Amino acid sequence: IAQAGYMLVGVAAGTEFGFSGTVYYLLVYLVTNLAVFAIISWVEKGSGSSAVSAFAGLNRRSPGMALVMMVALLSLGGIPPFGGFFAKVLVFGAAVQSHYVWLAVLGILNSVIALYYYLKIMKVMYLDKPDETSWKVTPALQWRVALALCIACIILLGVIYAPWLNGISLAVTGF
């Protein structure tokens, strides 16, 4: 729900910059959530639970899956160099440009709070020990390829943003 609120910050700005930022945010959010929900589904299949405790020791069970989840969570938290960081810069920057500084400040504060919860999940994945009913599910090749593509997009959208943003701006101004 918070992520949708961040997108609406760009809409509230009411400018081309804000609308472009919102569309960019949607693109980043799409690939990031694909990765997150794929990992949650995979963990639930292996453990029978989607509770945070089911992620305990994920790094030991599947280091690659833990890495994918970590990158996706850091992107959702708005940490550079991932796409979520640049998307938040765009929508919060649009708010500031439109004199909604208070809205940008609230969004940033909320992002910091959300990051705390994302870091708690990462702590469970990397530092907590798995329970005795250890499970191991090896993801199929198509899962691994899809997740690799998601992570590549999350990184590329954070590092090489100009071509994407230019295309989005052209689309936004066409309406």
Pin down the residues of each PLM region.
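Alpha-helical transmembrane segments of multi-pass membrane proteins predominantly involved
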Residues: 2-175
